[in-house]
Amino acid sequence: MDFLWTWLPFLLVSILAQFILAPIIVRFTSSHPACPEFEAAGIGQLPPDVAANLGRFVYAMNAEGFVLVGYFRQLAYMRNVGFYLALLKHPVHADTVYAMEMFANNGIVPVRSAHVEFCTDFTDGKEICTNNSKQPSVHKAHPGMRVHRFPEAQNPHLLYAIHRRLCANLAPGVAHVPMADGMEVFHLSYGTVKDVRKQAEFGYYYLDEKGNVFRPTLKGACRITWRLAWPIGAMRRSRMRKNARATMLSLGF
């Protein structure tokens, strides 16, 4: 009983911080640009470690038939958040892929993360995306965009094979829509904010026209923070890994 009373205050503070204070902070400080702008950059303009990582990725994807569109950077996508990425497209299969290195500075410890995502648009208006992000989405799923996460598929060749198999199984016989030449930067900008626009239709974000940014509603802020908070976040990550393994097995991997 003494043990319980010792730890009870810490538990209550944790619950208060994660489920009450965090949504309020996110509600009033978080934003997504409504029209994000991406700056093209040469590989020599990237930080050396980022350039090395993205360069290896481009070389690996060249072997799969992808061609490089370019390297891009967005150093102020959200408050204290920016990223670098390499964008490629497949001239035959009409697939696109990007490798992203994201960084965030919360004022205490700089945070870095990276993931790869393959995307295919179809003539019926749907989109299938396959990535290896280690974090489950905090957004509401919608039928127009099917996003599959395989956090243990860190080999880009394996991830692309999974993506191709998913496209064949989920959209058999439906033609792919290629990324138009000269529209790559627009496609990148629109694709970045497309899901946020959809979330706004669900009531999780609203457009702040003065700042030209999307901001979370209180409902959206609660959804974002609660789905990441412990122990919910840990359970969702565990379930995501389990589902990913089951899907890979069903696809023959």
Regions found by a protein language model. Name each.
Residues 58-211:
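Structured extramembrane domains adjacent to transmembrane segments
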Residues 1-11:
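Feature marks short, highly hydrophobic, charge-poor N-terminal signal-anchor/signal peptide-like helices
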Residues 24-40, 185-190, 201-216, 221-222, ...:
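Terminus-proximal functional modules
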Residues 217-253:
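Extended, charged low-complexity segments
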Residues 12, 190-193, 225-232:
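Short intrinsically disordered, low-complexity coil segments enriched in acidic
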